């Protein structure tokens, strides 16, 4: 069973419209404050991050504001990380229908993230450069968090009560059996590096190319089975808020999710990011580029999120503390969510484009043209769209059951499914 299917089996997904309607019917819940901090140490100079807190769903309307945070851990150079940092957000937003309400915008976001990742990958590969990058891309709109990721730059969520949740899936071949099976089914090989004498060393890699990852943006010289299709997860926080820790593998190769979360509880986001990096450095030294972004989603009127670790108290002081806490909760009960847990809205990690884009055809009613679900260009389905005489439906593949794709994006889809050979020699 796939990770995404298992998740849907274990959790009851709550329709986004239900949650938003619940907010509207209850007393008005103010938008949370978003506070953040960032820290980094460079070893190769291939880590990049993105912080944008002034984005607007409706240009000129501050009430439609949302925030974006990203980590881009490059390999074989920094060009893919830089390009993705500069273009991914625009490509994602362009895939969301204009004029969408907030409800519609959030519901369209998971699909738009897939289209944006694939479009960014196609555009970068057309530049002919060979570097690649992991991507962890976080969009925060009110209490709703949407995370899309390829690679191993993890994002965790720490909420009240010390519950730490993983919002990403590591696409490391060493740890992800499902991804190993996908690559071999697509014509790639998975194995360790062979050294003199036939001995195998190091982590599992895919060949050709030698990458330890199964998903990334870029990596032009590696097999096309290294796909840019992200794992996407969308959750809604309780009104008590939560803390995100987004970091490159320079952190996660050293610290577990629980250790990282516990190490910085009670600190501001800025100090928390610095402490996480410092803890990783103290444990094993600077082995790789190390970048950490901490984001606190804080209820309106609160200066901080998580309280500092409780000190030992005598029984009488402890009783008073519990009573004050209960009284405060009762006073705020009408303002805060009755459900003090994270509610899962969406999760999907399939590497099959048809699973992620749906089956509807996006049409331009004024011109009768069809819009490519990935790159958003309008084309006529009756024309020969390719530059080399190919048809919309490749003879090398079964009929495409997803939405309309232009020739370039159709070829990319076929390549990702192993229907076109690809050679490479890049190792990282």
Swiss-Prot record:
It catalyses: O-phospho-L-seryl-[protein] + H2O = L-seryl-[protein] + phosphate; O-phospho-L-threonyl-[protein] + H2O = L-threonyl-[protein] + phosphate. GO terms for molecular function: metal ion binding; protein serine/threonine phosphatase activity. InterPro entries: PP2C (IPR015655), PPM-type-like_dom_sf (IPR036457), PPM-type_phosphatase-like_dom (IPR001932). CDD domains: PP2Cc. The keyword Cell membrane does not apply. Its EC number is 3.1.3.16. Coiled coil: none annotated. It is an enzyme of class 3 (hydrolase). This is Probable protein phosphatase 2C 5. The lineage of its organism: Eukaryota, Viridiplantae, Streptophyta, Embryophyta, Tracheophyta.
């Amino acid at each position: 069973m796939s990770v995404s299917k298992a998740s849907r089996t274990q959790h009851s997904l709550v329709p986004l419209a239900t949650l938003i309607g619940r907010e509207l019917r209850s007393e008005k819940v103010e938008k949370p404050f978003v506070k953040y901090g960032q820290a980094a140490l460079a070893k190769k100079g291939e880590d990049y991050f993105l912080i944008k807190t002034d984005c607007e769903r409706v240009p000129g309307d501050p009430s439609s504001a949302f925030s974006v945070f990203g980590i881009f851990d490059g390999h074989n150079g920094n060009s893919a990380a830089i390009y993705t940092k500069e273009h991914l957000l625009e490509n994602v937003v362009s895939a969301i229908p204009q004029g969408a309400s907030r409800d519609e915008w959030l519901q369209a976001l998971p699909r738009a993230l897939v289209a944006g990742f694939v479009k960014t990958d196609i555009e970068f590969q057309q530049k002919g450069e060979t570097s690649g990058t992991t991507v962890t891309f976080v969009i925060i709109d009110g209490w709703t968090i949407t995370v899309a990721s390829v690679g191993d730059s993890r994002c965790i969520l720490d909420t009240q009560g010390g519950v730490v949740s993983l919002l990403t899936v590591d696409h490391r071949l060493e740890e992800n059996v499902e991804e190993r099976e996908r690559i071999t089914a697509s014509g790639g090989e998975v194995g360790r590096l062979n050294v003199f004498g036939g001995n195998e060393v190091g982590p599992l890699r895919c060949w050709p190319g030698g990458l330890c990852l199964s998903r990334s943006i870029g990596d032009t010289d590696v097999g096309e089975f290294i796909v840019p299709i992200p794992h996407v997860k969308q959750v809604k926080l309780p009104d008590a808020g939560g803390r995100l820790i987004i970091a490159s593998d320079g952190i996660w190769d050293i610290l577990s999710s629980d250790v990282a979360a516990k190490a910085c509880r009670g600190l501001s986001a800025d100090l928390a990011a610095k402490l996480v990096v410092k803890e990783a450095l103290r444990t094993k030294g600077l082995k790789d580029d190390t970048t950490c972004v901490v984001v606190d989603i804080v209820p309106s009127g609160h200066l901080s999120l998580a309280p500092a670790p409780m000190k030992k108290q005598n029984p009488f002081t402890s009783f008073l503390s519990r009573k004050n806490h209960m009284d405060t909760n009762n006073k705020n009960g009408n303002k805060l969510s009755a459900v003090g847990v994270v509610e899962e809205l969406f999760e999907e990690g399939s590497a099959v484009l048809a699973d992620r884009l749906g089956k509807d055809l996006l049409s331009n009613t004024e011109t009768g043209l069809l819009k490519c679900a990935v790159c958003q260009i309008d084309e006529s389905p009756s024309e020969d769209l390719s530059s080399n005489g190919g048809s919309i439906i490749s003879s090398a593949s079964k009929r495409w059951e997803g939405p309309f794709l232009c020739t370039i994006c159709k070829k990319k889809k076929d390549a990702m499914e192993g229907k076109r050979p690809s050679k490479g020699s890049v190792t990282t």
